[in-house]
Each structure stands twice: as C-alpha cells, then as structure tokens.
Regions:
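C-terminal functional segments of enzyme domains
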Residues: 15-18, 86-90, 94-163
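Phosphate/oxyanion-binding active-site loops and adjacent basic polyanion-contact surfaces
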Residues: 62-70, 107-111
C-alpha cells in the first residue's frame, strides 16, 4: 500500500466578483529527495458560467474554488493510485476538511452540490475509507524544512496562475 499526498488550492481571482476562480493541485511523493517529487500537477481558471452550469453557483467564492480544487485533483490524479493505496488531501481552507468529514454544516446549495460531486467521485474511484483530509496553515513563509508549507505555497501559485 502506498500513500499519495495531494495538495490543492482555490483562489477567487477577481475580487470585483466578475466570476473568475483559479484552482491548482499537485500530487507528490513526499519520500522523494528534498521536499518530495512531483508526480503530476494542474492549474485551471474557471469562469462564473462553469460554476453556474455545473453547480448552480450564482456567485464565485473562495470556498467554492477550494472545493472545486479537490474535485479536479481527484479526477486528474486518479491514474496514480491503486485499489489499496491511501490518498491524503492537504488544503489550507479548513472548510475542505470540515465539510468533507461532516463536521461543518453546509448552508449554501452550491457548496452542497460541489461536495456531492466530490462524494460521487470518491465512490466512483472506491476511495471510501482510504481518503483523508489534512488542514495546512496557509500563507506561511517557507522555513526550509516543512513540506506542507512548501507544497501549499506551490499550489497557491498554481491556483493564481503564476507557476
């Protein structure tokens, strides 16, 4: 059994609410040299019409971007893990962990729809019981030691399209 560490981030790119979100993710082998080895990565910009058409979101928000980042990561990186492997999603938005584990109640219908799509993807891939979520404190200066800080900063730049 292997463990795959996936770092995801979402960003509300347009603070004037013109409907632009960025999502980014990286899958790493943390036992590789240095901070680990990149196995795959993605960076996507999403428009308001995508969010509305797929999730019924009438507005773009940072929480929705964070969750869509998780959904994209599960779809993008599924080719890496097998039926017995463990997957850990690392995100700097606490809502990812709390909503996905049921500790927070979802109030917005579009957030519930995104979570439902993530749940469907987990079922489709058979990841139940093998997927966990870790919260990473965001926006920290890299200390040269902690891989969580390193990779979180990396996916933050992917989500903002500055890789």
């Amino acid at each position: 059994m292997k463990q795959f560490d996936v770092y995801t981030d979402g960003s509300h790119l347009d603070k004037q609410n013109n409907g632009r979100l960025g999502v980014g993710g990286v899958i790493v082998n943390l036992s590789g040299p240095g901070m680990g080895t990149i196995l795959g990565k993605f960076s996507n910009e999403l428009k308001q019409d995508y969010m509305y058409d797929n999730f019924g979101a009438s507005k773009c928000s940072n929480p929705s971007a964070e969750l869509v980042g998780v959904l994209f990561a599960l779809r993008e990186f599924s080719k890496f893990w097998g039926p017995l492997d463990k997957v850990v999603i690392h995100a700097d938005y606490l809502g990812v962990k709390e909503w996905m584990t049921g500790k927070w109640r979802i109030k917005e219908p579009y957030i519930a729809k995104i979570k439902s799509e993530i749940d469907k993807e987990i079922m489709k891939q058979g990841l139940q019981g093998r997927l966990s979520y870790e919260w990473v404190k965001g926006h920290q200066k890299f200390d040269g030691v902690n891989p969580d800080i390193y990779w979180n900063n990396y996916v933050d730049s992917l989500a903002k399209g500055i890789d």
